[in-house]
Design a protein with these regions (language model features):
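Structured non-transmembrane domains adjacent to transmembrane bundles in polytopic membrane proteins
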Residues: 1-51, 58-72, 76, 81
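Alpha-helical transmembrane segments of multi-pass membrane proteins
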Residues: 25, 29, 58, 128-140, ...
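Hydrophobic alpha-helical segments of membrane proteins
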Residues: 31, 35, 64-72, 101, ...
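Hydrophobic transmembrane alpha-helices
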Residues: 39-42, 59-60, 82-106, 147-150, ...
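Hydrophobic, glycine/alanine-rich multi-pass transmembrane helices and their short helix-loop junctions
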Residues: 39-43, 132-196
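Membrane-water interface of transmembrane alpha-helices in multipass transporters/channels
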Residues: 48-57, 76-94, 154-169
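Small-residue-enriched core segments of transmembrane alpha-helices in multipass membrane transport
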Residues: 52-73, 162-180
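Cytosolic juxtamembrane regions of multi-pass inner-membrane proteins
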Residues: 97-136, 148, 152
Length: 202
């Protein structure tokens, strides 16, 4: 029965629900924009199709592993923590921050490899030289980020703890397994196809 009265809900709970709904509705669009823009920028920068595809794939792989570990620790309750929930905003923040940092490491490494390749080195030799010359810098930068964000793990505020642990884990995975192992392996696997661009001139 229509009573002619409008009901409106307010309060912190309603506010939180609206925020979560907005994130859930727009997160896929945001991720798509990030991935497409990253692909275009890297394709233009390195004049390659394979390099940006590989970079995006490696980032998604590392972030997927990170989210799995976060669920294992915080949602299932391990390492002395009670089972709980992961705040919805946490994966979004971790994705955006880590995706940017990981791409920074990727550009730094691939730029050095490309520099050697353009000098006339084979793809394999360029990959080895690029890795050797950048591994210490990438590892040092990653360690600084891990220490800074890892310190958040000691707070009692759960969202802050989750952000700190998530970023620290993601950077650790990216700087070791991804950047120093998988990326060079893929570079060697694809060989000269790494630098292929269908409409490249010359």
């Amino acid at each position: 029965q229509d009573l002619g009265v409008d009901f409106k809900l307010s309060g912190q709970a309603k506010f939180n629900q609206e925020i979560f709904d907005e994130i859930a509705n727009k997160v896929l669009v945001a991720i798509a924009i990030i991935i497409v823009s990253t692909f275009i920028i890297l394709m233009i920068a390195f004049r390659s199709i394979i390099i940006p595809l590989k970079a995006i794939l490696m980032n998604i792989l590392g972030l997927g592993a990170t989210f799995g570990i976060l669920v294992y620790i915080f949602q299932y309750g391990h390492f002395g923590l009670e089972a709980g929930t992961i705040v919805l905003i946490i994966p979004v923040l971790v994705f955006c921050l880590v995706f940017g940092l990981s791409m920074d490491y990727e550009v730094f490494l691939i730029s050095r490899i490309q520099e050697e390749y353009l000098k006339g080195a084979t793809n394999t030799k360029a990959t080895i030289d690029g890795l050797v010359s950048t591994s210490k810098i990438i590892t040092s930068a990653a360690l600084i980020m891990i220490v800074i964000t890892g310190a958040f793990a000691f707070t009692e505020v759960m969202p802050v703890k989750q952000i700190g642990v998530g970023i620290a884990i993601a950077i650790a995975i990216d700087a070791t397994i991804i950047r120093l192992m998988l990326v060079p392996s893929f570079m060697k696997l694809f060989g000269d196809w790494n630098w292929w661009l269908p409409f490249k001139k010359g």
